Amino acid sequence: MAQVCSISVNHRHAGIEGIERARFRDPDVAMLRLLSLPGVSEAVVLQTCNRVEIYAVAESVEDIVGFARAEGMPLEIAEVRAGDDCLKGLLRLACGLESMIVGEDQILGQLKTALLQARRLGTIGPVLSTAIQKSIHVGARARIETEINKGSVSIGSAAVELAESLLGDLRGRTILVVGAGEMGTLVANAMAEKSLRAIYVANRTFEQAEKLASSLQGVAIRLERLCDYMGSADVVICATGAPHLIITKKMVEQCKGEKPLIFIDITNPRNIEETVGEVPGVTLHNIDSLRQINEASMRRRQGEARKVEAIIEEELVLLQRDIRRLHADRVIGDLYQRTDHIRATELRRAVARLSTAGSLTEQQISILHDFSMALTNKILAAPTRQLRRAAERCDEDCLRTAEELFDLWVEESNGIPGNKTKASKTD
């Protein structure tokens, strides 16, 4: 029977190189390819700077593992989950407990984006839609009822905290932020509170850089003029969504001034060439360097995390119930479809046989139709009640037995239950 399962390569077991290896060049293509596999009925891909995750509804976890292996995901550092373990992991993720920066809020927006994209592509169905929507609800509830997101709760704010720990004090410093999107904005806003000497904002779209810089009393610069400002900066934080290098070793060698320069790259894929750290007087940090910030964050939030865990346990029971109901609804739907196909076929035969003895009136045919519908519904009423009760008490065996007893298989040519191919695409 189909179940929810996931494969995740994330910061807990992989460094930035491992996460880069796991990334899909085109997540949309990956979702469509995954959905095309036999036994897979739903698929969602979630990619952030700290994780690459596949969520699917599949007959077997091995279906997803085989897909991930073929796509080149490093399974030796991946987490594979199925069933309730997968559902609980999704709730923990939305609550920020699985994040590098515990309690960070950005994951909720990332989950919403993944959900909407899967809907647009048509790769998601009722099970994953229910699970992800529930996770977003639980994540919001956790942040309202606890202080899990109090303090530095984003990669951006953690990068600022890292810069502060490296320099001791940011007052009077000059900061260059590369990127004016969501993450760049978080960094720039956090930096603006530190009594800086100057803050520069560079972005591919200059108008966006101007908008952000003006809100902070900073200076917007064009991306091609990075070198003109890099030499005067104390810290350069790269926070773009670009899939390629923006700052190279050669560029830094040409642009660096006399004073030490710190680079912090919080992107994935990385935007700063790894060899930049070899330039004399230059220090390069990436997402892996933020682990120390996360450890401190986790220590501060241990009490709040326990409160969140209690919320998760409570909501997990409700999610499990909802998923079971979906399974029961699918079995009941298949049962009614199978029965209605038989009813309609036999009704046509009865009308044809009666017509040989003389023409039937429209009223007589209507009476026969109503009779067949009433008979079918009354016969199925008790099995329907029992199947719903089975779902409530977690009796998967009962649901599976019903599928076998009523021969609930889908005919490939017309989608009518009663032939050879199992109805996994609606699970």
UniProtKB/Swiss-Prot annotation:
The gene is hemA. Keywords: NADP, Oxidoreductase, Porphyrin biosynthesis. This is Glutamyl-tRNA reductase. InterPro entries: 4pyrrol_synth_GluRdtase, 4pyrrol_synth_GluRdtase_dimer, 4pyrrol_synth_GluRdtase_N, GluRdtase_dimer_dom_sf, GluRdtase_N_sf, NAD(P)-bd_dom_sf, Shikm_DH/Glu-tRNA_Rdtase. Homodimer. Substrate binds at residues 48-51, 99, 104-106, 110. Catalyzes the NADPH-dependent reduction of glutamyl-tRNA(Glu) to glutamate 1-semialdehyde (GSA). NADP(+) binds at residues 179-184. It comes from Methanocella arvoryzae (strain DSM 22066 / NBRC 105507 / MRE50). GO terms for biological process: protoporphyrinogen IX biosynthetic process from glutamate. Belongs to the glutamyl-tRNA reductase family. Its EC number is 1.2.1.70. HAMAP family: Glu_tRNA_reductase. GO terms for molecular function: glutamyl-tRNA reductase activity; NADP binding. Pathway: Porphyrin-containing compound metabolism; protoporphyrin-IX biosynthesis; 5-aminolevulinate from L-glutamyl-tRNA(Glu): step 1/2. It catalyses: (S)-4-amino-5-oxopentanoate + tRNA(Glu) + NADP(+) = L-glutamyl-tRNA(Glu) + NADPH + H(+).
